[in-house]
Amino acid sequence: MVELEKEKIVWIAIILLIIFLVWETLKDLIAPIVFGMAASYIAYPFHIKLSKKVGKRNSVLILSGILSIFSLIFFVGVTLWITDTLKNLYNYLDAFFSWLSTLNVPGFLSSLFDALATSFPEKLRSILLQYTLSLPKLALQLIVFLAVFYATLLNADFLAKEIYELLPLTNRELGEKMIEKVKDTVDAILKTWLFFSVVKGIFLALGFYLFKISNVAGSIAAGVLCIVLELLPVVGGWIMWLAGAIILLRRSMLLAIIFAIYGIITISPIPDYFLKPKFAKERAKVSSVVALVGIFGGWIAFGAVGIILGPIAIGLLLALIDAWREIGTKQPSKAHRSQDA
């Protein structure tokens, strides 16, 4: 018995040591790993359609190649314009939060906006500066991101099967429900909220640059702020194209009208009413408050990777609460059991 206890202690120590070493190895790569998996999840439907025409491996190679090009553009952009972009972004954020404080919104939103006004700019600064101060580290993380994307997309079916096989036989229903809850949350956050926000931010940045409202750095900063605004309730990216149209109005009425039409078609409200519902109709709905708290709470707590981890954590908590309620309704109360006896 003593020998068994000693052996158990040794194995526990070995397992803890392995976990510690793995964590120390991966802790600086958590963000690219999570984002690589998230990108593969978004790309999976396109991969399925493309693989029917060119084959599974060729489809993965094509999508990985496209993502590699965008990653290279991102790296070059960070190298060339990050300092000026940060300056412009701080100016935009300061003006935006000053305007936001004048809105008459519910108390919990007002508190959230105040918290964002104090923490968001500094959090953004710390995250971006750690890359600008170490471009080799950023390059390494992009390589890891692309490698994870390729491997996850190539083995997506196998990984999905393995996840379900790892579920314990006892309370398997709870495990499956939690997986479905994570899937619903990730679908709503990645394939609807974040996807549309990023696309709108890209269109706004292009519009600001093509219409010469700002330089490259200022246009990128405007696109980033558009993404942030799209994630907030009440407000949205329309504020940015409206601001751009007002700036153009001082130069040319015609340019201001054309840019306003461009903003209506590519940013808001046309995409919100005609495209977004088509993407979201087949997916479970996630409360906008839950998504908002998850995204920005995750951002404040974990940095950029918290945008994904925050909503998933809240989704899992809600799944556990639902399961607890179901168990409570299935089990009769003590009083009821005593009456039956």
Swiss-Prot record:
Its main location: membrane. GO terms for cellular component: plasma membrane. It is a multi-pass membrane protein. The keyword Transmembrane applies. It holds the Pfam family AI-2E_transport. InterPro entries: AI-2E-like. Keywords: Cell membrane, Membrane, Transmembrane, Transmembrane helix, Transport. It is found in: Cell membrane. It comes from the Archaea. This is Putative transport protein PH1571. The chain crosses the membrane at residues 10-30, 62-82, 93-113, 140-160, 193-213, 227-247, 255-275, 289-309. Belongs to the autoinducer-2 exporter (AI-2E) (TC 2.A.86) family. The keyword Membrane applies.
